[in-house]
Amino acid sequence: MNRESENRRRNQRNVQRTNAVMGACAVALLAAQAASPAHAGAYEQARRIYERLDGVQPSATVLNTMANDILSQPGQAGLLAAAVVATDPHTGANFYDATLKEFINPWTNRNQSAFVPFNDYTATVIGMIRDDIPFNTVLSANILYTVNAPGLPAASPANNDHYATAEANGVDFATALQQTTQTVAYGTPSQGVAGVWTTHTGAAAYFVLGTNRAQFRFTMLNYLCHDMQLVMDNTRPTDRIRQDVARSPGGDSRVFLDNCAGCHSGMDPMAQAFAYYDFNSTTNEMVYTPGQVVPKYVKNPQNFPWGFVTPNDDWANRWRTGPNADLGWDQSLPGSGEGAASLGQELENTTAFANCQVVKVFQTVCMRTPTSSADQATVASIQALFTQSNYDLKQVFQQSAAACAGT
């Protein structure tokens, strides 16, 4: 009996050893078949493109599709075709559900946190990118994206419950977002709508309390990649700086002339575009009062009674001349206007706006700042294509992923 058991165990070990050898040979054979430099390189590039855009590994089917695109279309064309697959709502849902959400969320709050509940601002930008809406309308268009899914409260100008519930329910935002307008969904008069500025989230973050200068400052930071210290210009006239800015802080007028005036002389004439906006913390809604300047624009008049008293929402861009002309203002626009939407058009059509979007995307996808001469040349090329292709930001993600597929 013992001898029979030993023979049985020996036979089992031999079978297992044989199977292991055969399995190893099969794997080696498959590896040899797939390991030609072009084949292996295509699969590695496809995997890298997908992981950079979606943050997860692709399925075998999607990976094969992307690799075949790369193999069948040598050069940049194949890499771009693969990136298109990775950003398709049906094969690259995580691009919308995770990558874009984390990319956009910091713009929606003063703490610049990516970890905030899903909201109307983020949803609208994701929808614009998915649907190839020209991104140089993000600060001016009458647009809003809501979620088309069962069991959700209606979109409301007073909260983000509609969006937070959708996120909690695991809704696929890649396919569930639907376009509407803020006028239809929130009842905001069309003349008072200005892209993401007037979403519930945009208003709650940047029109609440204060003087509405925060909306301008964070727009410069998030959309032109310039914080205020980078655009200080003490050569601009000071005649439209409001009363609340002391001209001799601490009894020293040099502080105003050397510091305060450099920002306020350009910012205050443009932030006048927001003169009819406030945020009511009791009702939790944006307030828009066409024709009536909100009280925050005339607060603390005792600081300098001879300062500018805001009469309306007419704005003017004093930075079109001087050092801030380098921001690249669109000469086809007048440089002045009435209300927030026209100011949005002024800002979103600058060279700085286009460059900012491309640099942010490049940093996100390529995981590095474009400081080398090669990276700067890549950014310049993508930026040119961005403006020439109707400001399609999804293409910027695709082009950045293709450019960094080998690094």
Where are these regions (language model features)?
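N-terminal secretory signal peptides that target proteins for export/translocation
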Residues: 1-17
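Histidine-centered nuclease catalytic patch
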Residues: 272-275
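Boundary at the C-terminal end of the N-terminal hydrophobic targeting segment
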Residues: 34-42
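Bacterial N-terminal signal peptides
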Residues: 22-32
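Electron-transfer interface patches adjacent to heme c in soluble/periplasmic c-type cytochromes
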Residues: 202-212, 246-255, 265, 280-370, ...
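Extended surface/linker regions that mediate inter-domain or inter-protein docking
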Residues: 79-270, 348, 352, 362-365, ...
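Substrate/cofactor-recognition hotspot
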Residues: 42-93, 97-100, 277-329, 336, ...
